[in-house]
């Protein structure tokens, strides 16, 4: 029994993080697609900036947006500052040609996006966060794939750096892996979910987000797939985000995302209908369902079953595998101790981030099951 559990759990983890990407690579390694608009023919775009209590960064965000290499006559900029109790709306209003939407009632990010998108006047809408900085060419790179009529949405590239500007080794490495995976997904069929820091979609494909939705970005992008359009990935559409200032803030963010992932299974269950969406079902199950539901518990069961196999006198192979796991978790513990002191070392930080991420997934499952996760997003200190 324990041998079966061990191999099943190992299989789930290996397939989710290695097997699925390898399959995508094999099936699509020859596909190369490049779309672009000719200079002077760029489509008009509405940019929506979600900005709840972002007085510290909204000015720099708007300056960054206005400095993008894109025809200003083709841009509409909207700041959704709903529920903000600081000077976010006032600061944003000081910029010319910026539409500021502000009400005192706070309903959550999903409600803010639903309202803001009604004010978008252009056919392509870009959603971005106030704490995300874009490179000069990002908007052109993000919009280029829309030259293909089958493209319904485009996900940008996310980079996480420290306050000093250095890449965050654990999370940064994870996002490099995710970026590579998105490249393979784009070649195969579609990116499964887009990060809310930066993505674009055709306005006509937008489906209003239920107000109790936790991960609004995922809901919006999967609904694009439901209309048989692709979500592409633009590797050169770079957005940069400063990592959370504290482990506590990062923990809350990851638990919230994990809870949102579990919620998405009930909201977007038809993505698991292989008769209606065969390719999407394969990708959704392999990339999202396995990670959200199975991988974190599988890591726990893998360790427990390994311990029991060694105690029951199984072959030395299981003893070596257990020793590897112990060393891995020891490194993760050291990484945690270093992170508490705002220090990092690659050898320890990567195991720590992996454990931290999966522990947050477990907590998110429990939190959502208990109905404890609020739809209101809390801004992390950065």
Task: Please annotate each region the language model reported.
Residues 125:
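Short aromatic/hydrophobic "clamp" motif used to bind/position activated sugar donors
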Residues 1-39:
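N-terminal membrane-anchoring/stem segments of glycan-assembly enzymes
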Residues 146-164, 168-177, 212-216, 220-287, ...:
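Catalytic donor/gating beta->alpha subdomain of glycosyltransferases that bind UDP-sugars
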């Amino acid at each position: 029994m324990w041998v079966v559990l061990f191999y099943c759990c190992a299989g789930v983890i290996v397939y989710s993080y290695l097997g699925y990407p390898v399959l995508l690579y094999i099936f699509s390694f020859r596909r190369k697609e490049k779309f672009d608009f000719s200079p002077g023919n760029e489509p008009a775009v509405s940019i929506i900036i979600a900005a709840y209590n972002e007085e510290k960064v909204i000015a720099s965000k708007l300056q960054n947006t206005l400095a993008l290499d894109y025809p200003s006559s083709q841009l509409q900029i909207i700041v959704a500052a709903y529920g903000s109790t600081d000077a976010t709306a006032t600061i944003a209003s000081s910029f010319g040609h910026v539409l500021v939407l502000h009400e005192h009632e706070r309903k959550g990010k999903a409600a803010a996006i639903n309202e803001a998108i009604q004010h978008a006047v252009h056919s392509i809408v870009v959603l971005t966060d106030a704490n995300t900085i874009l490179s000069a060419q990002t908007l052109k790179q993000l919009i280029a794939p829309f030259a293909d009529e089958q493209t319904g949405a485009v996900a940008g590239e996310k980079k996480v750096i420290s306050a000093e500007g250095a890449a965050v080794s654990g999370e940064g490495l994870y996002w490099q892996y995710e970026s590579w995976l998105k490249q393979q997904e784009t070649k195969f069929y579609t990116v499964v979910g887009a990060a809310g820091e930066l993505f674009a979609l055709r306005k006509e494909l937008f489906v209003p987000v239920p107000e109790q939705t936790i991960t609004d970005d995922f809901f919006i992008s999967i609904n694009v797939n439901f209309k048989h359009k692709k979500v592409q990935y633009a590797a050169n559409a770079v957005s940069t985000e400063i990592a959370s200032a504290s482990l506590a803030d990062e923990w809350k963010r990851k638990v919230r995302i994990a809870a949102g992932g579990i919620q998405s299974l009930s909201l977007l269950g038809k993505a698991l209908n292989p008769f209606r969406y065969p390719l999407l079902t394969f990708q959704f199950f392999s990339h999202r369902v396995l990670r959200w539901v199975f991988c974190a518990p599988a890591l726990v069961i893998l360790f427990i079953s390994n311990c029991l196999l060694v105690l029951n006198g199984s072959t030395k192979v299981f003893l070596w595998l257990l020793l590897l796991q112990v060393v891995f978790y020891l490194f993760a513990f050291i990484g945690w101790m270093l992170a508490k002191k705002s220090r990092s070392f690659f050898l320890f930080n990567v195991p720590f981030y992996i454990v931290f991420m999966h522990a947050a997934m477990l907590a998110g499952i429990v939190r959502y099951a208990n109905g404890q996760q609020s739809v209101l997003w809390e801004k992390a200190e950065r």
